[in-house]
């Protein structure tokens, strides 16, 4: 039975320990990749690089999956980058979200790919395939990362050139970022590659 993402929060039971947030933007990059942003609760704290469980409201028990947070810890919204899995318990419905839809988010983020777990050094190498770039998207937009490393090297590999667009857009937007723009211009190296 398909999940209806249009259900208003007052029409379903909200599980304990869950925020109900609103989709603020959606961008489809390819037939298999998309990015979306949701509102951020004032009480939600996370460290750049962490992940959180998200789901969609429905009449039955919601299905939750772990998603890396692609936005930095200082951002006023929460960004996610996802693959579209046609028969995925969550992604088959999540890929259809639109601005204004509700998304469920557990209140406790977690993860170890965070700045305070990284030892300072000359270079930070970040190797990602596909949507695995999401936690690195968070880290390269965090000023703390640039305080710990002289050079950040982001290697992003996908099957086809079109699948690299999120990474290209991300790095291009860093130039205008008021917090890390100058640092990223001097220290961030982006190596996009394809396998086909």
Name the predicted role of every residue range.
Residues 4-101:
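Ferredoxin-reductase
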Residues 89-196:
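FNR/FR-type flavoprotein reductase catalytic core
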């Amino acid at each position: 039975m398909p999940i209806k993402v249009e259900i208003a929060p007052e029409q379903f039971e909200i599980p304990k320990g869950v925020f109900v947030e609103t989709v603020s933007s959606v961008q489809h990059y390819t037939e298999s990749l998309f990015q979306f942003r949701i509102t951020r609760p004032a009480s939600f704290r996370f460290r750049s690089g962490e992940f959180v469980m998200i789901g969609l409201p429905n009449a039955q028990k919601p299905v939750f999956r772990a998603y890396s947070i692609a936005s930095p810890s200082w951002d006023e919204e929460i960004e996610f980058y996802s693959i579209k899995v046609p028969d995925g318990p969550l992604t088959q419905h999540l890929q259809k979200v639109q601005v204004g839809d509700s998304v469920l988010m557990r209140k406790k983020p977690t993860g170890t790919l965070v700045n305070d777990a990284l030892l300072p050094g000359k270079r930070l190498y970040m190797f990602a395939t596909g949507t695995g770039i999401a936690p690195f998207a968070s880290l390269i937009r965090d000023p703390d990362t640039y305080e710990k490393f002289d050079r950040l090297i982001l290697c992003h590999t996908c099957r086809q050139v079109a699948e690299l667009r999120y990474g290209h857009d991300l790095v291009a937007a860093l130039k205008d970022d008021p917090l890390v723009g100058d640092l990223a211009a001097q220290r961030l190296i982006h190596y996009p590659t394809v396998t086909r």
